Design a protein with these regions (language model features):
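N-terminal glycine-rich anion-binding loops that anchor highly charged ligand groups
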Residues: 8-54, 62-70, 288-289
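A glycine-rich phosphate/pyrophosphate-binding beta-strand-loop-alpha-helix module
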Residues: 40, 88-144
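N-terminal basic/disordered segments at the start of proteins
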Residues: 1-12, 77-85
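Active-site cofactor/substrate anionic-group-binding motifs, chiefly glycine-
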Residues: 47-113
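Short glycine/serine- and small hydrophobic-enriched flexible loop segments
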Residues: 41-45, 96-100, 295-301
Length: 336
Protein backbone atom coordinates (compact mmCIF):
# COMPACT_ATOMS: atom_id res chain seq x y z
CA UNK A 1 0.00 0.00 0.00
CA UNK A 2 2.90 2.38 0.71
CA UNK A 3 4.12 1.96 -2.89
CA UNK A 4 0.62 2.73 -4.18
CA UNK A 5 0.41 5.88 -2.06
CA UNK A 6 3.83 6.92 -3.41
CA UNK A 7 2.42 6.69 -6.96
CA UNK A 8 -0.44 8.97 -5.91
CA UNK A 9 2.05 11.47 -4.43
CA UNK A 10 3.78 11.48 -7.84
CA UNK A 11 0.40 12.13 -9.53
CA UNK A 12 0.46 8.77 -11.31
CA UNK A 13 -2.96 7.35 -12.24
CA UNK A 14 -3.53 3.83 -10.96
CA UNK A 15 -4.21 1.13 -13.54
CA UNK A 16 -7.05 -1.34 -13.08
CA UNK A 17 -4.95 -3.99 -11.36
CA UNK A 18 -3.28 -1.65 -8.87
CA UNK A 19 -6.54 0.14 -8.02
CA UNK A 20 -8.31 -3.20 -7.63
CA UNK A 21 -5.57 -4.46 -5.30
CA UNK A 22 -5.65 -1.28 -3.20
CA UNK A 23 -9.43 -1.19 -2.72
CA UNK A 24 -9.54 -4.95 -2.14
CA UNK A 25 -6.99 -4.64 0.68
CA UNK A 26 -8.92 -1.74 2.21
CA UNK A 27 -12.31 -3.46 2.02
CA UNK A 28 -10.88 -6.70 3.43
CA UNK A 29 -9.78 -4.95 6.61
CA UNK A 30 -6.08 -5.38 5.83
CA UNK A 31 -5.14 -1.68 5.94
CA UNK A 32 -4.85 0.49 9.06
CA UNK A 33 -7.08 3.56 9.29
CA UNK A 34 -4.29 6.19 8.99
CA UNK A 35 -3.09 4.59 5.75
CA UNK A 36 -6.65 4.42 4.36
CA UNK A 37 -7.00 8.11 5.17
CA UNK A 38 -3.68 8.88 3.45
CA UNK A 39 -4.71 6.88 0.37
CA UNK A 40 -8.08 8.64 0.05
CA UNK A 41 -6.67 12.14 0.57
CA UNK A 42 -3.87 11.62 -1.95
CA UNK A 43 -6.21 10.04 -4.49
CA UNK A 44 -8.40 13.15 -4.20
CA UNK A 45 -5.38 15.43 -4.58
CA UNK A 46 -4.22 13.59 -7.72
CA UNK A 47 -7.69 13.58 -9.27
CA UNK A 48 -9.86 10.48 -9.59
CA UNK A 49 -10.06 8.85 -13.03
CA UNK A 50 -12.94 6.97 -14.63
CA UNK A 51 -10.89 3.75 -14.59
CA UNK A 52 -10.19 4.16 -10.87
CA UNK A 53 -13.91 4.62 -10.14
CA UNK A 54 -14.92 1.58 -12.20
CA UNK A 55 -12.17 -0.60 -10.68
CA UNK A 56 -13.19 0.38 -7.14
CA UNK A 57 -16.87 -0.18 -7.96
CA UNK A 58 -16.13 -3.69 -9.20
CA UNK A 59 -14.36 -4.52 -5.93
CA UNK A 60 -17.24 -3.09 -3.92
CA UNK A 61 -19.70 -5.15 -5.96
CA UNK A 62 -17.67 -8.30 -5.35
CA UNK A 63 -17.78 -7.67 -1.58
CA UNK A 64 -21.54 -7.02 -1.46
CA UNK A 65 -24.37 -9.35 -0.47
CA UNK A 66 -25.77 -9.63 -3.97
CA UNK A 67 -29.12 -10.81 -5.31
CA UNK A 68 -29.18 -12.67 -8.62
CA UNK A 69 -32.13 -11.51 -10.73
CA UNK A 70 -30.68 -12.69 -14.03
CA UNK A 71 -30.42 -10.20 -16.88
CA UNK A 72 -33.86 -8.65 -16.51
CA UNK A 73 -34.78 -5.06 -17.26
CA UNK A 74 -34.87 -3.90 -13.64
CA UNK A 75 -33.93 -0.27 -13.03
CA UNK A 76 -32.03 1.42 -10.20
CA UNK A 77 -32.87 5.02 -9.27
CA UNK A 78 -29.89 5.61 -6.96
CA UNK A 79 -28.00 8.87 -7.40
CA UNK A 80 -25.09 10.50 -5.63
CA UNK A 81 -27.01 12.78 -3.28
CA UNK A 82 -24.71 15.43 -1.88
CA UNK A 83 -26.55 18.43 -3.34
CA UNK A 84 -27.15 20.09 0.03
CA UNK A 85 -30.68 20.94 -1.14
CA UNK A 86 -33.50 19.69 1.06
CA UNK A 87 -36.32 18.62 -1.23
CA UNK A 88 -38.80 15.75 -0.96
CA UNK A 89 -37.62 12.23 -1.83
CA UNK A 90 -38.30 12.47 -5.54
CA UNK A 91 -36.44 9.38 -6.75
CA UNK A 92 -38.16 7.16 -4.16
CA UNK A 93 -41.63 8.47 -5.01
CA UNK A 94 -40.93 8.18 -8.74
CA UNK A 95 -39.84 4.56 -8.24
CA UNK A 96 -43.30 3.55 -7.01
CA UNK A 97 -44.97 5.28 -9.94
CA UNK A 98 -42.69 3.48 -12.40
CA UNK A 99 -43.37 0.16 -10.64
CA UNK A 100 -47.10 0.81 -10.96
CA UNK A 101 -46.53 1.22 -14.71
CA UNK A 102 -44.85 -2.16 -15.12
CA UNK A 103 -41.19 -1.32 -14.46
CA UNK A 104 -39.20 -3.41 -12.01
CA UNK A 105 -37.32 -1.08 -9.67
CA UNK A 106 -34.41 -2.26 -7.52
CA UNK A 107 -33.65 0.95 -5.64
CA UNK A 108 -30.33 1.12 -3.86
CA UNK A 109 -30.22 3.71 -1.07
CA UNK A 110 -29.41 4.78 2.45
CA UNK A 111 -30.35 7.16 5.22
CA UNK A 112 -29.85 10.87 4.63
CA UNK A 113 -26.31 12.20 4.86
CA UNK A 114 -26.27 15.54 3.03
CA UNK A 115 -30.08 15.80 3.02
CA UNK A 116 -32.42 15.65 5.99
CA UNK A 117 -34.45 12.83 4.47
CA UNK A 118 -32.81 9.92 2.69
CA UNK A 119 -34.79 7.19 0.94
CA UNK A 120 -34.45 4.89 3.97
CA UNK A 121 -35.73 7.61 6.30
CA UNK A 122 -38.81 8.17 4.14
CA UNK A 123 -39.68 4.49 3.82
CA UNK A 124 -39.34 3.89 7.55
CA UNK A 125 -41.55 6.89 8.38
CA UNK A 126 -44.10 5.52 5.90
CA UNK A 127 -44.14 2.29 7.90
CA UNK A 128 -42.07 0.00 5.67
CA UNK A 129 -39.68 -2.64 6.97
CA UNK A 130 -36.44 -2.19 5.01
CA UNK A 131 -34.42 -4.93 6.72
CA UNK A 132 -35.31 -7.95 4.59
CA UNK A 133 -33.01 -10.77 3.51
CA UNK A 134 -32.39 -11.68 -0.12
CA UNK A 135 -35.14 -14.30 -0.44
CA UNK A 136 -37.80 -11.96 0.90
CA UNK A 137 -36.59 -9.16 -1.36
CA UNK A 138 -37.08 -11.35 -4.43
CA UNK A 139 -40.58 -12.19 -3.25
CA UNK A 140 -41.45 -8.51 -2.72
CA UNK A 141 -40.08 -7.54 -6.14
CA UNK A 142 -42.11 -10.24 -7.90
CA UNK A 143 -45.27 -9.13 -6.13
CA UNK A 144 -44.96 -5.33 -6.05
CA UNK A 145 -42.37 -4.44 -8.71
CA UNK A 146 -40.25 -2.46 -6.24
CA UNK A 147 -37.63 -3.30 -3.63
CA UNK A 148 -35.41 -1.12 -1.50
CA UNK A 149 -31.81 -2.28 -1.13
CA UNK A 150 -30.64 -0.73 2.13
CA UNK A 151 -26.93 -0.09 1.54
CA UNK A 152 -25.60 -0.98 5.04
CA UNK A 153 -27.16 -4.46 4.81
CA UNK A 154 -25.59 -5.20 1.42
CA UNK A 155 -22.22 -3.44 1.73
CA UNK A 156 -20.93 -4.60 5.09
CA UNK A 157 -17.28 -4.20 4.03
CA UNK A 158 -17.84 -0.43 4.07
CA UNK A 159 -17.30 -0.60 7.84
CA UNK A 160 -13.56 -0.76 7.14
CA UNK A 161 -13.51 2.69 5.49
CA UNK A 162 -16.01 4.57 7.66
CA UNK A 163 -13.55 5.81 10.36
CA UNK A 164 -11.18 7.25 7.74
CA UNK A 165 -14.02 8.86 5.78
CA UNK A 166 -15.42 10.44 8.93
CA UNK A 167 -12.04 11.87 9.88
CA UNK A 168 -11.50 13.30 6.38
CA UNK A 169 -14.92 14.96 6.51
CA UNK A 170 -15.00 15.67 2.76
CA UNK A 171 -16.16 13.76 -0.31
CA UNK A 172 -13.86 10.92 -1.38
CA UNK A 173 -14.05 8.26 -4.08
CA UNK A 174 -16.50 6.36 -1.86
CA UNK A 175 -19.07 9.13 -2.39
CA UNK A 176 -18.93 8.25 -6.08
CA UNK A 177 -19.27 4.47 -5.74
CA UNK A 178 -22.75 3.96 -4.25
CA UNK A 179 -24.65 4.59 -7.49
CA UNK A 180 -22.41 2.08 -9.31
CA UNK A 181 -22.81 -0.79 -6.85
CA UNK A 182 -26.42 -1.98 -7.04
CA UNK A 183 -26.59 -5.36 -5.22
CA UNK A 184 -28.94 -6.71 -7.90
CA UNK A 185 -26.45 -5.75 -10.62
CA UNK A 186 -29.02 -3.50 -12.33
CA UNK A 187 -28.00 -2.71 -15.90
CA UNK A 188 -30.42 0.21 -16.28
CA UNK A 189 -30.41 3.33 -14.14
CA UNK A 190 -31.45 6.93 -13.74
CA UNK A 191 -28.42 8.34 -11.97
CA UNK A 192 -28.58 11.86 -10.56
CA UNK A 193 -25.28 13.61 -9.83
CA UNK A 194 -24.50 16.57 -7.55
CA UNK A 195 -22.03 18.11 -10.00
CA UNK A 196 -22.48 18.82 -13.71
CA UNK A 197 -18.83 17.82 -14.18
CA UNK A 198 -19.72 14.22 -13.31
CA UNK A 199 -22.21 13.75 -16.17
CA UNK A 200 -19.81 12.46 -18.82
CA UNK A 201 -17.56 10.82 -16.20
CA UNK A 202 -20.44 8.72 -14.87
CA UNK A 203 -21.61 7.94 -18.38
CA UNK A 204 -18.17 6.55 -19.19
CA UNK A 205 -17.93 4.69 -15.86
CA UNK A 206 -21.34 3.13 -16.54
CA UNK A 207 -20.04 1.99 -19.91
CA UNK A 208 -16.90 0.50 -18.34
CA UNK A 209 -19.21 -1.39 -15.95
CA UNK A 210 -21.15 -2.74 -18.96
CA UNK A 211 -24.43 -1.03 -18.13
CA UNK A 212 -27.06 -1.28 -20.86
CA UNK A 213 -29.07 1.94 -20.57
CA UNK A 214 -28.35 4.82 -18.19
CA UNK A 215 -29.53 8.42 -17.89
CA UNK A 216 -27.05 10.50 -15.88
CA UNK A 217 -28.84 13.72 -14.90
CA UNK A 218 -28.10 17.05 -13.22
CA UNK A 219 -30.52 19.95 -12.86
CA UNK A 220 -29.33 23.46 -13.64
CA UNK A 221 -30.69 24.31 -10.17
CA UNK A 222 -28.18 21.90 -8.59
CA UNK A 223 -30.56 18.97 -8.06
CA UNK A 224 -29.49 15.37 -8.71
CA UNK A 225 -32.86 14.71 -10.37
CA UNK A 226 -34.66 15.70 -13.55
CA UNK A 227 -35.83 19.13 -12.42
CA UNK A 228 -39.18 20.89 -12.71
CA UNK A 229 -37.59 24.27 -11.88
CA UNK A 230 -35.07 24.59 -14.72
CA UNK A 231 -33.41 22.72 -17.56
CA UNK A 232 -31.72 19.39 -16.85
CA UNK A 233 -28.46 18.22 -18.38
CA UNK A 234 -28.50 14.57 -19.47
CA UNK A 235 -25.85 12.09 -20.55
CA UNK A 236 -27.48 8.98 -21.97
CA UNK A 237 -25.62 5.69 -22.32
CA UNK A 238 -27.43 3.25 -24.56
CA UNK A 239 -25.90 0.15 -26.12
CA UNK A 240 -22.38 1.46 -25.61
CA UNK A 241 -23.01 4.92 -27.09
CA UNK A 242 -22.99 8.21 -25.16
CA UNK A 243 -25.28 11.09 -26.09
CA UNK A 244 -25.45 14.43 -24.27
CA UNK A 245 -28.48 16.73 -24.38
CA UNK A 246 -30.71 19.04 -22.35
CA UNK A 247 -34.38 18.73 -21.46
CA UNK A 248 -36.78 21.15 -19.81
CA UNK A 249 -40.24 20.91 -18.23
CA UNK A 250 -41.89 22.52 -21.26
CA UNK A 251 -40.75 19.59 -23.43
CA UNK A 252 -43.28 17.48 -21.52
CA UNK A 253 -46.11 20.01 -21.32
CA UNK A 254 -45.21 20.95 -17.74
CA UNK A 255 -44.76 24.39 -16.19
CA UNK A 256 -41.65 25.45 -14.32
CA UNK A 257 -41.91 25.89 -10.57
CA UNK A 258 -39.90 27.48 -7.80
CA UNK A 259 -37.68 25.09 -5.87
CA UNK A 260 -39.34 26.20 -2.62
CA UNK A 261 -42.44 24.22 -3.69
CA UNK A 262 -40.33 21.04 -3.49
CA UNK A 263 -38.71 21.62 -0.12
CA UNK A 264 -39.09 19.21 2.79
CA UNK A 265 -37.23 19.67 6.06
CA UNK A 266 -38.09 16.24 7.50
CA UNK A 267 -39.06 12.75 6.27
CA UNK A 268 -42.57 13.47 7.60
CA UNK A 269 -42.89 16.57 5.41
CA UNK A 270 -41.56 14.64 2.44
CA UNK A 271 -44.12 11.88 2.97
CA UNK A 272 -46.92 14.44 3.24
CA UNK A 273 -45.99 15.95 -0.14
CA UNK A 274 -45.70 12.52 -1.77
CA UNK A 275 -49.01 11.28 -0.35
CA UNK A 276 -50.77 14.38 -1.72
CA UNK A 277 -49.28 13.73 -5.18
CA UNK A 278 -50.31 10.05 -4.96
CA UNK A 279 -53.85 11.18 -4.08
CA UNK A 280 -53.96 12.99 -7.43
CA UNK A 281 -53.26 16.53 -6.21
CA UNK A 282 -51.72 18.48 -9.08
CA UNK A 283 -48.63 20.36 -7.94
CA UNK A 284 -44.96 20.95 -8.81
CA UNK A 285 -44.22 17.90 -6.62
CA UNK A 286 -46.51 15.72 -8.73
CA UNK A 287 -44.99 17.12 -11.94
CA UNK A 288 -41.46 16.41 -10.73
CA UNK A 289 -42.39 12.87 -9.73
CA UNK A 290 -43.88 12.39 -13.22
CA UNK A 291 -40.70 13.58 -14.92
CA UNK A 292 -38.46 11.19 -13.03
CA UNK A 293 -40.89 8.25 -13.16
CA UNK A 294 -41.19 8.83 -16.90
CA UNK A 295 -37.44 8.40 -17.24
CA UNK A 296 -37.53 5.10 -15.33
CA UNK A 297 -40.43 3.84 -17.45
CA UNK A 298 -38.38 4.67 -20.55
CA UNK A 299 -35.29 2.90 -19.18
CA UNK A 300 -37.34 -0.20 -18.37
CA UNK A 301 -38.83 -0.23 -21.90
CA UNK A 302 -42.34 0.20 -20.44
CA UNK A 303 -42.51 3.33 -22.62
CA UNK A 304 -40.78 4.28 -25.85
CA UNK A 305 -39.56 7.71 -24.74
CA UNK A 306 -39.28 9.86 -21.63
CA UNK A 307 -42.21 11.95 -22.93
CA UNK A 308 -44.42 8.89 -23.29
CA UNK A 309 -43.29 7.77 -19.83
CA UNK A 310 -44.21 11.14 -18.28
CA UNK A 311 -47.74 10.89 -19.71
CA UNK A 312 -48.11 7.37 -18.31
CA UNK A 313 -46.74 8.50 -14.94
CA UNK A 314 -49.34 11.29 -14.72
CA UNK A 315 -52.06 8.75 -15.41
CA UNK A 316 -50.75 6.38 -12.72
CA UNK A 317 -50.64 9.20 -10.17
CA UNK A 318 -54.18 10.30 -10.92
CA UNK A 319 -55.87 6.88 -11.18
CA UNK A 320 -54.60 5.65 -7.81
CA UNK A 321 -52.29 2.91 -9.12
CA UNK A 322 -49.12 4.56 -7.79
CA UNK A 323 -50.73 4.97 -4.37
CA UNK A 324 -51.79 1.31 -4.41
CA UNK A 325 -48.25 0.16 -5.27
CA UNK A 326 -46.84 2.22 -2.41
CA UNK A 327 -49.41 0.79 0.02
CA UNK A 328 -48.84 -2.77 -1.20
CA UNK A 329 -45.10 -2.44 -0.68
CA UNK A 330 -45.49 -1.20 2.90
CA UNK A 331 -48.01 -3.93 3.68
CA UNK A 332 -45.92 -6.73 2.18
CA UNK A 333 -42.70 -5.66 3.92
CA UNK A 334 -44.50 -6.01 7.24
CA UNK A 335 -46.11 -9.38 6.49
CA UNK A 336 -42.97 -11.41 5.70
Amino acid sequence: MREIIKKLEERIDLDNQIMTDAVNQIMSGEVEDPMIEDFLIKLNAKGITENEISSAAQVMRSKSLSIDLGNGAHVDTCGTGGTGLNIFNCSTAASFVAAAGGAQITKHGNKGVSSKSGSADLLMIAGANINHDRNHLKEILNEVGFIFLFAPLHHQAMKFVMPARQRIGKKTIFNLLGPHTNPCNAKRQILGVYDKGLLKTFGNVSNLLKMHHVLVVHGNDGLDEISITDKTFVTELKDGNLNQFEIQPEDFGLSRANITALEAETPEESLELINAAFEGKESPVQDMISLNAGASLYLSSASNSIKEGVSLAKELLNNGKAKQTFSSYIEMTNSL
